A protein has these predicted regions:
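Substrate-binding pocket helix/loop in short-chain dehydrogenase/reductase
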Residues: 20-21, 28-33, 132
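Active-site loop immediately N-terminal to the catalytic Tyr-X3-Lys motif
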Residues: 22, 69-75, 97-98, 139, ...
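Active-site loop-to-helix junction immediately N-terminal to the catalytic Tyr of the SDR YXXXK motif
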Residues: 24, 70-78, 90, 118
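Active-site helix of classical SDR
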Residues: 44, 80, 88
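Alpha-helical segment proximal to the catalytic Tyr-Lys
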Residues: 49, 93-97, 160
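Residue(s) in the substrate-gating loop at a strand-loop-helix junction
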Residues: 64
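Short C-terminal tail/terminal secondary-structure segment
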Residues: 69, 152, 163-177
C-alpha cells in the first residue's frame, strides 16, 4: 500500500543450481519453483489488481532461453522458466482487455553472479562457462548491460500494442539452424 500505484512490474528473480537430472532431488525442485515461478505468481497477485484499477500498465517477466533450448544440468531451472513463459502468455491473454501488456524477456547465458554460482556447482566450472560461450553464435556471454534497453522499451508507451510476446536476448542462441 505504501508503494503507490504500480504502472510497471519487472519480475526478475532467479535461482539455479547445476545438477544432472538423474541426481536432482525433490528439495531442489521445490526451492527453484518457489523462487522462479511462485515468486512471480505472488508478485502478480499483489500488483495486478492495483495496476488494473489504475487503468493498466506493463508487466515484464524475465525467464530464460534455457526454457527454449534446454541446457544440460539445468532441467529444473528450464522447467521453472518454461512454466513462467506459459503462465505469462496465458495471463497476457486474460488481461489484454484490461490494458495490461505482459511480455517475457528470455536472456541467454549472462556474465553474472548467478551464472558463476551455477558454474561453481558443476564438476568443471571453467569448462561449463566455455560451453555456454560456445553455444552462443556471437561467441560471448551476455553482459547485464545487454538487457535494460529491451526492458525499457517494453515498459514504455512505445510498447502499448505489444503483449504476450517472448523475446530472446541471447546473441542468437535460439536461432534456427
Amino acid at each position: 500500500n505504501d508503494l503507490g500505484v504500480p504502472t510497471v512490474l519487472v519480475n526478475n528473480a532467479g535461482f539455479d543450481r547445476f545438477m544432472p537430472f538423474l541426481k536432482t532431488e525433490p528439495k531442489l525442485w521445490d526451492q527453484l519453483i518457489a523462487v522462479n515461478l511462485t515468486g512471480a505468481l505472488n508478485m502478480h497477485h499483489v500488483v495486478l489488481p492495483k495496476m488494473i484499477a489504475a487503468g493498466g500498465g506493463k508487466v515484464i517477466n524475465v525467464a530464460s532461453d534455457a526454457a527454449r533450448v534446454g541446457s544440460s544440468g539445468e532441467s529444473v531451472y528450464a522447467a521453472c522458466k518454461a512454466g513462467l513463459v506459459g503462465f505469462s502468455k496465458t495471463v497476457a491473454r486474460e488481461l489484454a482487455t484490461k490494458n495490461v501488456c505482459l511480455n517475457v524477456v528470455c536472456p541467454g547465458p549472462t556474465d553474472t553472479a548467478l551464472l558463476k554460482g551455477v558454474a561453481e556447482t558443476a564438476p568443471n566450472p571453467e569448462k561449463l562457462l566455455e560451453a555456454f560461450r560456445n553455444a552462443v553464435p556471437m561467441k560471448r556471454l551476455a553482459q547485464p548491460e545487454d538487457y535494460p534497453g529491451i526492458i525499457a522499451l517494453l515498459a514504455s508507451d512505445d510498447a502499448n500494442f505489444i503483449t504476450g510476446q517472448v523475446i530472446s536476448v541471447s546473441g542468437g542462441l535460439t536461432m534456427a539452424g
